[in-house]
Amino acid sequence: TKDLEMQKGVPYPRGFKKMPNIVGNSETTAPEHVELALKELIEWYKKNKKKVHPLILALEFHKRYEEIHPFQDGNGRTGRLIMNKILLSSGYQPIIVYKENKLAYFNALAKAREGRTKNYYQFMLEQTKKAYDFLEDTARKY
């Protein structure tokens, strides 16, 4: 809607990022390469959809998407939404990263960018357990 087109009185940017952005201390894909990088990511997904376990597929897609960081804002939310769509489509529960774990989430992604994906996978699986425990506790109350 038109209301969403403004953010703090400034027109909200549309489309892919126009300026470089940095996540933590890591550079992301340059604006002029975003479209190609996303096409390659989609091709990677299609190629691996039937070969790779859905959990690994979703986590790896999310990691790669965040490395591209195609928009000026909202990349984390969008990336987690896509990751959870992949998980839900395969019968797995979504992964919720709670606000209090935001810094640890950024650190896990940074380590993954350095090639230490085990830390990232472990962190995300811990979030899955927390979400499951929350759902289980909530269900018991009713």
Describe each model-derived feature in a short phrase.
Residues T1-D73, R77-Y142:
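FIC/Doc superfamily catalytic core
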